């Protein structure tokens, strides 16, 4: 989409900044719960904080050594992400198709995600009589065999959102959106 990421550490080199990242999102290996943090800038005022971080990181027994090696390989290897996010790329096409189709369903709207592999559509709860988003996603799963996650599962306080993952192939996204549309045609809690 032409968006450019600016590292906050580069914007304020005189301040201590902490940057977090991980394999799951940055390197498309969902489920690999391996991450890291980098501290930049003057660290002398944060000595106690850094010692605490060091202590916490040393408390884990049985470190996930294979995943630690995966980080090194990921950071030092060929960076293929542009092949997926530029026009014609799989992740961009999947995101665009999911966003296009979800916004064609009456009473459902969504902002186009930028940099995420998820969407968080809003559903008109009055139109569909939804008062329990957990029941909504459960009913959808039972009737149409489509799994979404209720918005309240992400600390959203109203039952008017749900989460969609945009990682499946386009044909599966199309099928899921067709099933959601069919489900909503006669759904009312």
Residue ranges and their predicted role:
Residues 21-22, 36, 112, 120-122, ...:
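Short beta-strand segments
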Residues 19, 106-110, 147-153:
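A short linear hydrophobic-aromatic micro-motif
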Residues 10-89, 99-100, 184:
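Conserved core segment of the aminotransferase class I/II
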Residues 1-8:
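Conserved PLP phosphate-binding loop immediately N-terminal to the Schiff-base lysine helix
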Residues 72, 88-102, 110-124, 158:
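Conserved glycine-rich beta-strand-loop-beta hairpin in the small C-terminal domain of fold type I
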Residues 129-131, 139-148, 154-189:
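PLP-dependent enzyme catalytic core of the Aspartate aminotransferase-like
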Residues 40-41, 76, 122-124, 167-169:
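Residue-level recognition of strand-loop junctions within catalytic nucleotide-signaling folds
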């Amino acid at each position: 989409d032409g968006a450019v990421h600016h590292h906050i550490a580069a914007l304020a080199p005189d301040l201590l900044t902490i940057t977090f990242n991980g394999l799951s999102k940055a390197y498309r290996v969902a489920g690999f719960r391996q991450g890291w943090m980098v501290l930049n800038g003057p660290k002398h005022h944060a000595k106690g904080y850094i010692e605490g971080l060091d202590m916490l990181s040393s408390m884990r027994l049985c470190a996930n050594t294979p995943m630690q090696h995966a980080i090194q390989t990921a950071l030092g290897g060929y960076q293929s992400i542009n092949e997926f996010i530029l026009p014609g790329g799989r992740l961009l096409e999947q995101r665009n198709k999911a966003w296009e189709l979800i916004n064609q369903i009456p009473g459902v709207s969504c902002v186009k995600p930028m940099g995420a592999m998820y969407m968080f559509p809003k559903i008109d709860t009055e139109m569909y009589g939804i008062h329990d988003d957990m029941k909504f996603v459960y009913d959808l799963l039972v009737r149409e065999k489509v799994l979404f996650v209720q918005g309240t599962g992400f600390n959203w306080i109203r039952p008017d959102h749900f989460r969609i993952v945009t990682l499946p192939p386009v044909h599966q996204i199309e099928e899921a959106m067709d099933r959601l549309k069919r489900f909503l045609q006669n759904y009312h809690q």
